[in-house]
Amino acid sequence: MAHKKAGGSTRNGRDSEAKRLGVKRFGGEAVLAGSIIVRQRGTKFHAGTNVGCGRDHTLFAKADGKVKFEVKGPKNRKYISIVAE
């Protein structure tokens, strides 16, 4: 008779839910105040003019305008600003 022993258990098989991080509004796009621009872990992007930073480091628009990405400062940090139209 053909027999097969019971398979052993495994300690794998779990993964966390994706957090949907990343840039939500790109350079040159028009945004309204309150729009989320970037969802991030830590400050990969820093808040420039007319941009606020939430407690989870989410960057959001504080005014209506166009999104502008820029690299500035001695540490070449990436800043996101809103330029009023």
From Swiss-Prot:
Disulfide bonds: none
A molecular function (GO) term: structural constituent of ribosome
Chain positions covered by the region annotation Disordered: 1-20
Keyword Transmembrane helix: no
InterPro entries in the cross-refs: Ribosomal_bL27, Ribosomal_bL27_CS
Name of encoding gene: rpmA
SUPFAM superfamilies: Ribosomal L27 protein-like
Highest rank taxon of the organism: Bacteria
Protein source organism: Salmonella typhimurium (strain LT2 / SGSC1412 / ATCC 700720)
Entry keyword set: Ribonucleoprotein, Ribosomal protein
Family named by the database record: Belongs to the bacterial ribosomal protein bL27 family.
This protein's name: Large ribosomal subunit protein bL27
A GO cellular-component term linked to this record: cytosolic large ribosomal subunit
Biological-process GO terms, alphabetical: translation
Any matching Pfam family: Ribosomal_L27
